Amino acid sequence: MLKFQETAKCVGRRPTVIPMYPTALIARRYVLQQKLGSGSFGTVYLVSDKKAKPGEELKVLKEISVGELNPNETVQANVEAQLLSRLHHPAIVRFHASFMEQETFCIITEYCEGRDLDYRIQEYKEAGKVFAENQIVEWFIQLLLGVDYMHERRILHRDLKSKNIFLKNNLLKIGDFGVSRLLMGSCELATTLTGTPHYMSPEALKHQGYDAKSDIWSLACILYEMCCLDHAFAGSSFLSVVLNIVEGKTPSLPDRYPRELNTIMERMLNKSPSLRPSAADILKAPYMEEQLQLLMCKYPEMTLEDKNSVCQKEAAHTINAVQKKLHLQTLQALSDTQKTTPRERMWLRKLQAADERARRLKKIAEENYKENDKRMQALRSRNVGSVHAHVLHELDERTLESLPEPQSLPCLDLDELEPSLEDTIVDLGHYEIPEDPLVAEQYYSDVFDSCSEDSEEQEEEMIFSEAGGDTKEEESPSVYRTNQQDSDTAALVGCLEHVLGYTSLDTKTITNAVTDMSPGPMVFNSAVARTKMKRMKESAVQKLGMETFEEVYDYLKRARHQNAREAEIWEHLETVVPRASDCFEVDQLLYFEELLLTMEGKEPSLQNLPCEAAQKKPVKGTHFCDNP
C-alpha cells in the first residue's frame, strides 16, 4: 500500500535560482540571491547584505504578503518578528531586522548553510547511513536547551518538526516561528489547527488545547526520526496517522541505542500531557547530566562572563511586545521613514519637536486656566451671603494676603523658540551646517543617524512605543546573550555551564508519579478554523486542479460516509491522480470540516468517519470516530 509522505516545502532543498537584478535593492541594502522555498506563510530567499561585515553578508529574507489585509488589520507576521527579536540563544535562529517593502512584510534572519534537519535525514537515508549515537545525543541536548529557553519565557513554538530545524556549523537551530504564540493568563493553553500531523500531540489532534508539553511531544518525534530516519507515527492517510498517534502503541528505539535514552523518549511520548517531563526535567535526568559533562569535555575551554538570569523580565518584555496591536498603517509609516534621507529625517524630527513643544505649552495653559478658575470659584463661595460691607472688605483683604503673587508668562520669541524646539526631542548638537556639499553630507551622516540595522531597529522601537502607548524599558542582559565576538559554540558552552550549575544541586529522575490533570475541551475559534480550512482548500486546488479536487472531495466524502476500506479508497484515488498521497490535504480538509461541525454543536454530515481501526474499535475522546 502506498504510504503517505508529507508534502515537501522546498526549504532546505536545492535552491531555485530566481531572476536577478543587480541594481535593485530591498530596503536599500539587501540583494536577492536565490529562492530557498516556502515557510509557514511566506516565501524565503537568500539575500546578500551590502552593509554587513565581511563574512556575514549572507542572510535569509522571509517575505510575507500583506496586500490583502485591510489597513486596520493586525499584521500577524509582526508577531514572529517580535518573538525572534527577544530570543537570543545559540539553538535559535538569530533575528536581524524587520520592515515593510511595498505590500510585503520582510523578516531578516541569519543564514544556516547546512539546510534543514529533514534534508540531512533524507540524505543519510538515501545513502544507507545512520547518525552516530553521540551526534544524536549532542543535537538532542541542543534542542532541549533551545526549547527550555523558549518555555522559560512563556513562548510556544507549536510547529516543531525536522523541516523547521536548521544546521549551522553542525549546530542545530530552531526556526520558523510563524505559528508561535505566548502562554497568556492562568489558562496556559492555546487551541490550534496548525502543525504537521506526524509531530502533533494527541491533545492537539483531539482539540483539547496546546501547551508546553505538546512541544515536548514534537521534540520526542524528532528524536525518534534522528535515530530511525523515519516518522515515529506513520500511516497511509491523515486519519490513519491520527489514529496511530491517539490510540497507537508508543514506539521504541532500536536496541543499538541506550535504554536510558529510549526511556526518556517514551516518557516524552506519554498520551497524558501532565505525565510528560518538561525540557528542564529531561536535562536534570542522570543520563542527560552525564552526557552534558561529556559534551563539556568535547568543546575547547572557553570563558564567558557570568550573568544573572532574567527570565521573568524577558517574559514580560515578550508579552508586552506581542500584546501591542501593530497595524498595517503603522508598518507602512515605518517603511516610509526608513526610506528617507538623513536630511529629511532631521526635518521630521524638528516637526515632531515643534509639535511636542506646542502640546506642552497647551497643557500648561490649560492647567493655569483651571487653577485660576478654581481660585475664582473659591472667592465667590466665600463672598456669598455676606451682609455687612466691612466684613466683605475684611474677607477680600485676607484672601488677597493668602493668595500667591501672580506670575506673568513671558512672551514667546520665535527666534528663541526655534532652537529650543530642536532640543526638545533629540539633541542635534551645537554645530553649524557646513556649506560644502561633501562635508555637509558627512555632517548629516555623523550627527543625525545612519541606515544601519541598529539605527533602523531603534527607530522601529520608537514607532512601536508610539503606536502602543507605552515606553520601552531598559533590557537586562541575559545569561544566554553573549558579545558579538562570541561564537555559537561559545554561547552553547555558556548554556551547558548554566544547566550543569543547577543539575548538580537538583538532580532528579523522571518519574510517573504525577497526577493526571489532562485539560478538558477548550473554547473553539471557528473563525480561525474556517480561515485555515480555506487556505488548505486553496492549496489542494492549486496542486490538483479544480475539477480533480472536486472529484476527489466528493469521492472521499462518500467513501468516508460509507465506511469504505482504506485499501479500496487508495486504489480508487490512484486511478484519479498520479499519486494518491497528493489527496492528503483533501482528506485533512474533510476531517477539519467534521471537527468544526462537531465543535459548533451541529450534526456532522459524516456519521462515521471511516478507518479500519475505527470499524473495529471506536477511539475514545476523539471527535472523528464518535458521534456527538
Swiss-Prot record:
Subcellular location: Nucleus; Nucleus, Nucleolus
UniProt cross-references to Pfam families, sorted A to Z: Pkinase (PF00069)
Sequence segments annotated as region (Disordered): 452-475
Means of activity regulation: Autorepressed by intramolecular binding of the C-terminus which dissociates following phosphorylation by NEK2. Activated in response to DNA damage. Inhibited by zinc.
Claim: Metal-binding is one of the keywords in the record: yes
UniProt record, GO biological process: intracellular signal transduction; mitotic intra-S DNA damage checkpoint signaling; protein phosphorylation; regulation of mitotic cell cycle phase transition
Start-end of Acidic residues biased regions: 452-463
Quaternary context: Interacts with NEK2.
Function: Protein kinase which plays an important role in the G2/M checkpoint response to DNA damage. Controls degradation of CDC25A by directly phosphorylating it on residues whose phosphorylation is required for BTRC-mediated polyubiquitination and degradation.
Family note: Belongs to the protein kinase superfamily. NEK Ser/Thr protein kinase family. NIMA subfamily.
Name of the protein this chain belongs to: Serine/threonine-protein kinase Nek11
Organism: Mus musculus (Mouse)
Gene behind the chain: Nek11
